[in-house]
UniProtKB/Swiss-Prot annotation:
Protein name: 4-hydroxyphenylpyruvate dioxygenase
Keywords: Dioxygenase, Iron, Metal-binding, Oxidoreductase, Phenylalanine catabolism, Repeat, Tyrosine catabolism
Domain VOC: 22-156, 184-338
Pathway: Amino-acid degradation; L-phenylalanine degradation; acetoacetate and fumarate from L-phenylalanine: step 3/6
Length: 381
């Protein structure tokens, strides 16, 4: 097992060849955007803030923009394809099911970011261009990454609209929760084919100047039956973190193999969301119908011995099936949903950090065994 951590010095940050401001949006291509928006409003406590559709001139697609803190999700479905983009989205849903089509990144200079990326080997999907409305101007560009996923580069300096030109402000679908369920996107995890993890890690190293933050291989990321490998790349400020997983050869089909089969190739596996109160988050999401992975009671029998004291009592962690991990910098609390659609593909992680910038290394075995139990129920192990 190897785990490496790299802390980028301030001088390197100042010379960052691909500066980022953070995640701009996670964009989903879905079969029914209205129903998806309602689900994430009720089950995830998100707030509908913007809309684009036939009522305001978009004849081809309907899109709903939801926010929670700094996290922004966009759900888009095709009404009737009339351009290459609409045809692509329709085919994306047909092949992959509901899934992430775009991990949009906010940058201070979209033209410079696009030029640097293309110069260093990225495939351009959209040249830098301006879009305008009464709220100001946004510069957009896009590059390809693994599978059919893209990174739209968004420069929105001075823009004060609800999302982007072409969108109008929208009223929430449901009454917002008394307490925000989550505050930000923590990281976005991609699954790629066997033998391609290092290729895509190298892509982010070259194209965006991201550094390797952590690496997980060996026994700590394997069970009796299945295994995988993972490396994490991040920008110099750690605002954007992308773990990349690939399957490893083992006795049975791993969770990565299952994803690749049912998604139809590489793509975004899960999105981790920061919360400052994971207990309230899990209680609210469970009450709204979200299903989480189960953890055996035996996990909690010795938890206090190796994880130490946390702000949440062990009996509450046991009740809610929340996992704990601790490293030299602190600890984290985390829990994973089951897939949020019928295909066993995209799911979510809720994470509460107390110093630790890790990814739950100590929980990998318990997590993977929980996923294997679900795979076995589906007949996919």
């Amino acid at each position: 097992m190897t785990q490496t951590t790299h802390h980028t010095p301030d001088t390197a940050r100042q010379a960052d060849p691909f500066p980022v401001k953070g995640m701009d949006a996670v964009v989903f291509a879905v079969g029914n955007a209205k129903q998806a928006a309602h689900y994430y409003s009720t089950a995830f406590g998100m707030k509908l803030v913007a809309y684009s559709g036939p009522e305001n001139g978009s004849r081809e697609t309907a899109s709903y923009v939801l926010e929670s803190g700094s996290a922004r999700f966009v759900f888009t479905s095709v009404i009737k394809p009339s351009t290459d983009w609409g045809t692509f989205l329709a085919q994306h849903v047909a092949e992959h099911g509901d899934g992430v089509v775009d991990l949009a990144i906010e940058v201070p200079d979209a033209r410079a970011a696009h030029a640097y990326a293309v110069e260093h080997g990225a495939r351009s999907l959209a040249e830098p261009h301006e879009v305008k409305d009464e709220h100001g101007t946004v510069v957009l560009a896009a590059i390809a990454t693994y599978g059919e996923t893209r990174h739209t580069l968004v420069e929105r300096t001075g823009y004060d609209g609800p999302y982007l030109p072409g969108y109008v402000a929208a009223k929430p679908m449901v009454a917002p929760p008394a307490q925000r369920v989550f505050q930000a996107v923590d990281h976005c995890v991609g699954n790629v084919e066997l033998g391609r993890m290092n290729e895509w890690v190298g892509f982010y190293n070259k194209v965006m100047g991201f550094t390797n933050m952590k690496e997980f291989v060996g026994d700590d990321i394997a069970t009796e039956y299945s295994a995988l490998m993972s490396k994490v790349v991040a920008d110099g400020t750690l605002k954007v973190k992308f773990p990349i997983n690939e399957p490893a050869i083992a006795k049975k089909k791993s969770q990565i193999d299952e994803y690749l089969e049912f998604y139809g190739g590489a793509g975004v596996q899960h999105i981790a969301l920061n919360t400052n109160d994971i207990v309230a988050t899990v209680r609210a999401m469970r009450a709204a119908g979200v299903e989480f992975l189960d953890t055996p009671d035996s996990y909690y029998d010795t938890l206090g011995e190796w994880a130490g004291e946390t702000r949440v009592p062990v009996d509450v962690l046991r009740e809610l099936k929340i996992l704990v991990d601790r490293d030299e910098d602190g600890y984290l609390l985390q829990i994973f949903t089951k897939p949020v659609q019928d295909r066993p593909t995209v799911f979510f992680e809720m994470i509460e950090r107390h110093g630790s910038m890790g990814f739950g290394k100590g929980n990998f075995k318990a997590l993977f065994e929980a996923i294997e139990r679900e795979q076995e129920k589906r007949g996919n192990l």
